[in-house]
Amino acid sequence: MGWNQTFLFLAFAATAASSLVGSGTSLQLNGIDYFVSPFSQGKVTNGSVAINTRQNQLGFVPATVIAGDLYTESTLQSLFLNWSTVDDVWQPAFLETIFVFNFAKLTNKNHNYHDGVSSSVFPLQVTHKIPSGPYFLNVHTGEVHPAYRLYDDFAGAFTQSLLQRPDGRFQTLSAQVPAAASITIGVPSRLYFTKTEAKPLAGVRIGVKDIFSLAGVKKGCGNRAWYHLYPVANSTGTAMQNLIDKGAIIVGVQKTSQFANGETPTADWVDYHSPFNPRGDGYQDPATSSAGAGSSIASYEWLDLAVGSDTGGSIRGPATVQGIFGNRPSHGLVSLDNVMPLSPKLDTPGFLARDPCLWNAANAALYRDKYTFFGHQAPRYPKKLYLLDFPAGNTSHAPILQNFVTKLAKFLDTSPTNIDLNKEWERTRPTSAGDQSLAQLLNTTYAAIISKDQAKLVREPFYRDYAAVHDGRLPFVNPVPLARWTWGDSQPSSLLSDAVRNKTLFMDWFNGNILPPSSDPLTCSSGLLLHVNGSADFVSRNRYINPPVPPFGFSNSQISLFAETPDSVFPLGQVPVFSSITNNTEYLPVTIDVVAAKGFQLQRDWARLRAILAPALYVDYTKIGKEKWDAMSADDFMAMVSNDDFLGDPCVKTQHLIGATYWERVSESKVIGHHQLRAAHQVYTSPDLKTVKLRGHSHATNEHYYVKSNGVWKFAGLKPEVRWNEYKFEEVFKGSYTQSEKHS
């Protein structure tokens, strides 16, 4: 075989082995840019379609599908008028070709439902339901493809535009509209989706911070080297899957400051350019680390929600400076698997939103049964309203804040109380804190936790993996995370344990003395604490800043992250401020933070306990002078432990610490855990948990029994043996002593 023949053979072989896969098509209809999904929604007719239209492009024509039969010929025009109002994807140009489910109801097959548009109506011939709305019809196959409207990300909030695939994975939405150094985002028609009890987020468009893994998507964490080093994710994390399962449509990945550390534009943002804050003169700091999330919600009406994370203020900061809703929930409400950590001890996922009703529905979808919602019953509102470090009355935003406080106090039927956290600490601080002030106790706590945790969990494996494929080189890292990691390296390993101890000291003090949880499930929080996180002043991005330093100090915004309490931002209004950039008066938002007690449901979650119980439990209390049950039913066990005489007592707070442990494998379906325990208890004079009546601690060993039931491991009983007690342990539970002694 000659050289030319060999070349031709190899070229042919290479061609035969290649594949051509469609990734969608971009079209323009009446001056509006669209993306035609590569995935068919189904056939509206069998075979090709002969349609006389001037709109045919690449075999696609715009079409409207009407799937239901709840219409008449006379109501179609009002239906289309309503569609123009509720949907930004559909437009009258889609009316040239209409497919209707109940074709026989129409007597006129050619009609003008909109001025200037002549409609041809065809029967909808399908065996499965195609949602109503705008589509692009492939005239050769009779298949309709969903229409996505394309928008320019002019605020620079996104890193990737995504398309959800039918198999649950994601791929890049391959389209670009005319723009200057910004990407294009595609959104599907809202008409395709119907909200139901099972799908309360159906059709809700969401952007996701670039630290959450999505199946089929490469994650960057704000670092170019990271993005190019690691492959696409194989699975979607629990938090994002919760939203998808409830109907959410994820349209793109959004910018984060690098590795979710706090960065200031513009110098700190080296690998990627910081998103733009649309408020004021348009050149203000968007705050971080959920910068893309905040910027997008403040900039785009076509986006409904953005998912961010809050470790030290990464949601609340962007919400504050851009005048939108944002929340840091109680810590630990949802798993953060497949999420890049700053510190698991502090990380929480939350939302940035414009619509409080949608915000509420999203919270319920994300946090599931750990989210308390009073939509179906009347709550009892707390009567304590604390004001923390409110601005002086002569500041521009003070009147707006005071107006809100006045209305809230009236609604709660209470009076606000100014609180000095430092004085309260000095008056009631635990003895183990010594003479330290809050500022002294917590000065390095945040810096120590995030620098030590992230260096171990993120930097070390990242550096190792990068070096393995780049001849031992180090990847580039922005100045802020690098400065924090470097400082952490210079500190002793004991710094982290000291920081965790100090955080716990503050958490126990705050949750016991300032905002204890309420025993009333219709109240949850004993009070509300209001503080102001922003001053309605310009913080421009066109300024030179000093080199980064570790985040030392303690501020009111850190209360919730150390106490693990919810802290939500509410926009209230705006104030005029003169801009030297525009040489004009612009407006900046005014917001307020509302802190509540750590979720009551997290203190005693009986539903979660019931779910892990075996049908029958072996309960042996003979070693502590009580009875033994060889086969106590799960319901009886729940009734016993949740009784007011036992763990259900709202005046008792308990904490169990596990020490040494070993496991005994009895069989394939039974295991015994041998645990060393310290059970600490405090009894309060009332359910507000303000005043301690007595303490009682028990040191014990405990056998916990576990059995496999229907393939799932369940808790099947316990056998405690007390070694010694401290204080008045015998008087902790009301069921442990005589009626005459009860809480006298």
Curated annotation (Swiss-Prot):
Pfam families reported for this sequence: Amidase, Scytalone_dh
GO MF annotation: an example: lyase activity
UniProt KW keywords: Lyase
Broad class of enzyme this protein falls into: lyase
UniProt-annotated binding residues for substrate: 621, 702
EC id: 4.2.1.-
UniProt keyword Lyase, yes or no: yes
Active site feature: 656, 681
Family: Belongs to the scytalone dehydratase family.
Subunit structure: Homotrimer. Each subunit contains an active site, located in the central part of the hydrophobic core of the monomer, which functions independently.
Summary of the function given for this chain in its UniProt record: Scytalone dehydratase-like protein; part of the Pks2 gene cluster that mediates the formation of infectious structures (appressoria), enabling these fungi to kill insects faster. The product of the Pks2 gene cluster is different from the one of Pks1 and has still not been identified.
The protein's name: Scytalone dehydratase-like protein Arp1
Natural source organism: Metarhizium brunneum (strain ARSEF 3297)
Taxonomy of the source species: Eukaryota, Fungi, Dikarya, Ascomycota, Pezizomycotina
Gene designation: Arp1
